[in-house]
Amino acid sequence: MDDNKSKALTAAVGQIEKQFGKGAIMRLGDNQAMDIEAISTGSLTIDIALGIGGLPCGRVVEIYGPESSGKTTLTLQVIAEAQKNGKTCAFVDAEHALDPVYAEKLGVNIDELLVSQPDTGEQALEICDMLVRSGAVDVVIVDSVAALTPKAEIEGDMGDSHVGLQARLMSQALRKLTANIKRSNTLCIFINQIRMKIGVMFGNPETTTGGNALKFYSSVRLDIRRIGAVKEGDEVVGNETRVKVVKNKVAPPFKQAEFMIRYGEGISKEAELIDLGVKQKLVDKAGAWYSYKGDRIGQGKANVMKYLKEHPETANEIETKIRQELLLSKTVKAEEALPQGEDDVLPE
């Protein structure tokens, strides 16, 4: 750059900083926060699929799926992991269906968790914005977008038509929220439900509620599905669950994670460790027997899970080795992250 242009640029940058404050404009390489801090999801396979070891702080995340697929369970596990690291979490319960007993079973410290049960969608999003702007809350969960009912709809009569009200509400709220979320480095998770588009002959008829704004503003979108039942004898004790990373702006997208959710316990970390341990050749499998470092640790997956529960030091050792092999670090450099368009969708 020639001297005249350089002087003009320096003067312009100086004027911008004087008017709008230091940090209003900077060179990308000058930014200290090049590393993206991540909060673990409580599932090792999802952390690996996300590429940075968890959900990114300072970003909007959308988790959607059919009913009883494990959306709320996954977000409660995120809260439990965040609280273990001394972070403050808030749960905006628009569905009025949060079960504190179940949350406690998943490891959530309910005495420290902030909970709000708002009356209207506007109130819910205003509370969310105020918590984010405070800078004191690290994780905010909104459960769910479908339950964010606009005030006009609540005050109107049953059967009144309110076309696009919720979509407009979400669009306006996200325009306000995103800058504050980035500034305060808060992880904001929106849980969403699935609806069917009428008259779709070809392609996927499924869509999420609340319009398209959330799809664009989200840095990570997770599609969670129940793919089978976990049985002990004739009794169903849990779900086999699959998560697809439909959109990821901080690492390569379209990865999948499969794990087990046990009723009353949440995501089974031991089952993940066994599957990933065998895959990475850290755990040896011969027939039904599993061995670690030459020592037999159990016959059959159920017995090995029991062994790992009773020997947490072995479980932690296996987890550390898996993370070292599959995640180079818990954060990813911004320049290493794969760029992805905002309107990229999972191919059919």
UniProtKB/Swiss-Prot annotation:
The keyword DNA-binding applies. Signal peptide: none annotated. InterPro entries: AAA+_ATPase, DNA_recomb/repair_RecA, DNA_recomb/repair_RecA_CS, P-loop_NTPase, RecA-like_C, RecA-like_N, RecA_ATP-bd, RecA_C_sf. Keywords: ATP-binding, Cytoplasm, DNA damage, DNA recombination, DNA repair, DNA-binding, Nucleotide-binding, SOS response. It holds the Pfam family RecA. It is found in: Cytoplasm. GO terms for cellular component: cytosol. The keyword ATP-binding applies. It comes from the Bacteria. GO terms for molecular function: ATP binding; ATP hydrolysis activity; ATP-dependent DNA damage sensor activity; damaged DNA binding; single-stranded DNA binding. GO terms for biological process: DNA recombination; DNA repair; SOS response. ATP binds at residues 65-72. Belongs to the RecA family. Can catalyze the hydrolysis of ATP in the presence of single-stranded DNA, the ATP-dependent uptake of single-stranded DNA by duplex DNA, and the ATP-dependent hybridization of homologous single-stranded DNAs. It interacts with LexA causing its activation and leading to its autocatalytic cleavage. This is Protein RecA. It comes from Alteromonas mediterranea (strain DSM 17117 / CIP 110805 / LMG 28347 / Deep ecotype).
